Structures are given as structure tokens and as C-alpha cells.
Regions:
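Short internal beta-strands
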Residues: 73-81, 148-151, 232, 305-308, ...
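Extreme N-terminal, non-catalytic leader segments
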Residues: 136-198
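C-terminal lobe/tail of nucleotide-utilizing enzymes
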Residues: 46-49, 53-55, 76, 87-105, ...
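Walker A (P-loop) phosphate-binding motif
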Residues: 186-224, 228
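Conserved catalytic-core segment of NTP-binding enzymes
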Residues: 153-155, 161-162, 180-182, 189, ...
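ATP-dependent carboxylate-amine ligase catalytic core
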Residues: 3-4, 12, 18, 24-45, ...
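Phosphate-bearing ligand-interacting subdomains
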Residues: 100-143, 147-157
């Protein structure tokens, strides 16, 4: 007997795992935790599906998880184009021991067991799955893998996937699925009660490396003894394991600033951090997306780091729209929000190391700001950028030496 769609949706209404207490003020990221981690201290295993997109802009979820993952032990990446190669070497020219395989069967052979999770690692502009993608996810479910998806198309709204989850006794996690509208918060202005510096990592385009730069900066300052909290605003950083987060582009626009403000306030009250770093999305100048505006409104940053890809001529997935200049983006950000750009970070796509270093020197002279590339240059350049802008951070770093 087929179970009704209404009953299926009721069963799977909660696509995040709830805490034992029902405090409505708890951040969504604290509630979301893979089932295997909820009941088992061992980090669960996962494979990432990224066919024909690994190391490309639409493969940014897979790219991010290969570089950094707190929630999962990444066992392999599925992309037949690079099968047999090392994921770290393909992505960053540095081997990391994560193999790339051609299909699910090879991933299982490589892992010598069925992984706990199948992560859909592609982030298409449409936010939707193709028919082939759906068949592959259903196949993974039939092999007893739980599913993690960061798309706007929610699998838990599809009776086909709900029935499969019951049939195979697996879970589905729609990372972008927002809270009930009655639980959403509007902006209150209490963000100004947050006394520690708040740095937003913004950019001149989407899929530019803002999350990577924010993560590297958070890790480095934390390793120096500072208490630094990264506020995640996109699906990849939530999947990576950020504790405080909101998938901002899935929140109704009226509540975007308030939801981000609420998460920052909770991080500040719970953690008493020295510094809060906010992951940026898209670009304030981008004609297709508005998330950057909500990030500036909701976080009211005391400083902005701007990421730019000098060799990118047109906006990602928008070949008719030229990239903005660094100067115009800085002017727009500083006009739109009561903040200042404290430094520039580069995405070195299409550039040699020598070209990157040359442009760093040129931009430093042109803008009078600290300029670096978080992936190819010494990470100390990032910490210097922050310490130069915020004397209290410089003092705390000096105390920790």
C-alpha cells in the first residue's frame, strides 16, 4: 500500500535534526548535524558527486568539501573526467589523498564499504536537478546512503524521494530548506550591541573563493589563540560544518537581514568571540543576485575584505555581463554600507604565480591596501590585513605570542 504524500511530508517535515531542548532562539546550524554524528562520535564517511564539474565554478560545493570538512570524512569525489587522479592535485596542485573515481560503484570499491553519506556536490545556477542526477541519487539511496543536497529543489518535497527514503531506511537533508515563516526574524538593530569586529568577505562575482578565504582566515586566527567565529551564509559552508549559519538565499527577502543578524547575535552571546567573520555571497554589483545587500544590512560589518579574480572577464554563468572593476565595487560597498574595505584578496584562476605576485604589488600600490591570495601566498598576509585594520586584534595577537 502506498503511503500518502501528505503523510510522507509530515514524516519528513524536519529535514534538520533538532536539539533536545526546543529553544526557538538556537541557531539553525547548531541543530543541523548528520545522523551518524548525532549518535556516534566518529565522523561519518561521505562521497561527493560532481560529474563534469569538479574544479569548476559549478563544482564549488565539492571543491569546498575537498579543502575543508568538519562534518564528514570525504572518501572520494565522483567525476569521470578526472577518474584516477587525486582531488587535491586537480584542485590546488597539492595531493590530499582523496581519490577521484568514475562512478558510485568505484567509490564503494575505493572505500571498501558503503559510505554513510552521498553529497550532491554541484551548485548549478538553476538550483535544480537533471533527470540523470535524480536517477543517480536514487541509486545511492538504494545502496543505503543518506543524502545531502544543497539545492533549491528540495528532495523532501518530492514523493519519489520520500518513498525511497522509507523503502531504504535512509535520511535526506535539504540544507537550504528554510525554517517555518513563523519562526523567521526581522532586523532589530541589535547587531550594534556586538562589540567585537565583524568582517564580511565580499566579492566582485559569485563562485570566486570568498568562502575559502573566510575559512582560511578563521583557521589561521584561531590557531593564533583568538576566538574567531565564522558565520556561514551558503550551503557549502553549512555542509562543511559551520556551527552558526543561515542559507540566506533561501530565506524570504523580508527576513534575510533579520535572520543573519539573529545568527550573529547568538554567536556573539554564546561564544564571546574576539572576531566574527561573515561569509559573503555573490557581489553587491551583480544584477542577478541580492544576497550581498542583505549581508551588508544584516551584519553591519565594521570591515570588508574584497575578493576579485583579475583574469575573469565576465561574470560566472553570465557571459554578457563584464566583471566590475575593483574600484567601482569598493565605491559601491562603501556607499551602500557604513563600512570600509580593509584589504583585497585575489582568485588566481588563469594566472601564474608570478602574475599573481605582480598584481599583488600593483594593487597594493594602486589602492593602498593589503593585498594577498589566500591559497598561494603566506597566510600571515591575511592576519596582517586584519591586525592593521583593528588595533584590538593586533593587541590580542601580540598577547598570544
Amino acid at each position: 500500500m502506498s503511503i500518502s504524500t501528505r503523510k510522507l511530508r509530515n514524516i519528513f517535515k524536519l529535514t534538520t535534526i533538532e536539539d533536545t531542548d526546543n529553544n526557538d532562539d538556537s541557531p539553525r546550524s547548531t541543530s543541523w548535524l548528520p545522523l551518524a554524528q548525532k549518535f556516534n562520535p566518529v565522523i561519518p564517511s561521505a562521497i561527493i558527486y560532481c560529474e563534469n564539474n569538479f574544479a569548476k565554478t559549478d563544482g564549488k560545493t565539492a571543491n569546498g568539501l575537498v579543502r575543508h570538512s568538519l562534518n564528514y570524512r570525504i572518501q572520494s569525489v565522483i567525476d569521470s573526467e578526472y577518474a584516477g587522479l587525486d582531488a587535491g592535485e586537480v584542485l590546488d596542485n597539492k595531493k590530499n589523498g582523496i581519490p577521484i573515481v568514475a562512478n558510485i560503484e568505484e567509490a564503494i570499491i575505493e572505500a571498501e564499504s558503503v559510505p554513510d553519506y552521498f553529497i550532491f556536490g554541484i551548485a548549478p545556477t538553476s538550483g535544480c536537478l537533471s533527470d540523470l542526477d535524480k536517477r543517480i541519487i536514487l541509486h545511492a539511496m538504494s545502496l543505503k546512503m543518506n543524502i545531502v543536497s544543497g539545492l533549491h529543489e528540495f528532495l523532501t518535497d518530492d514523493p519519489l524521494f520520500l518513498e525511497a527514503s522509507l523503502k531504504y531506511n535512509v535520511k535526506i537533508f535539504d540544507i537550504r530548506k528554510p525554517k517555518d515563516k513563523r519562526e523567521l526574524k526581522t532586523f532589530s538593530g541589535k547587531i550594534h550591541d556586538v562589540k567585537c569586529p565583524r568582517i564580511a568577505v565580499m566579492g566582485t562575482d559569485c563562485a570566486l573563493g570568498k568562502r575559502t578565504t573566510a575559512t582560511i582566515l578563521t583557521k589561521e586566527l584561531s590557531s593564533k589563540g583568538l576566538k574567531v567565529i565564522l558565520i556561514a551564509t551558503g550551503q557549502t559552508s553549512i555542509i562543511q560544518g559551520a556551527r552558526y549559519c543561515v542559507a540566506l538565499d533561501a530565506v524570504p527577502s523580508q527576513f534575510c537581514a533579520g535572520e543573519l543578524e539573529s545568527v550573529i547575535l547568538q554567536a556573539y552571546e554564546n561564544e564571546k568571540p574576539d572576531l566574527i567573520i561573515i561569509e559573503g555571497q555573490g557581489a553587491l554589483s551583480h544584477p542577478a543576485f541580492s544576497t550581498s545587500a542583505f549581508i551588508l544590512r544584516g551584519s553591519c560589518p565594521t570591515g570588508v575584505i574584497l575578493q576579485h579574480a583579475p583574469k575573469r572577464l565576465y561574470r560566472s554563468d553570465f557571459p554578457d555581463y563584464p566583471m566590475p572593476s575593483i574600484a567601482s565595487e569598493i565605491n559601491l560597498i562603501e556607499t551602500f554600507s557604513n563600512t570600509s574595505v580593509i584589504g583585497l584578496t585575489l582568485n588566481h584562476e588563469g594566472m601564474t604565480l608570478e602574475e599573481t605576485r605582480s598584481l599583488i604589488d600593483n594593487y597594493t600600490a594602486e589602492f593602498g591596501l593589503t593585498v594577498t591570495d589566500a591559497l598561494t601566498q603566506p597566510v600571515q598576509h591575511l592576519t596582517h590585513m586584519v591586525a592593521s585594520a583593528f588595533p584590538q586584534i593586533a593587541s590580542k595577537l601580540a598577547e598570544k605570542r
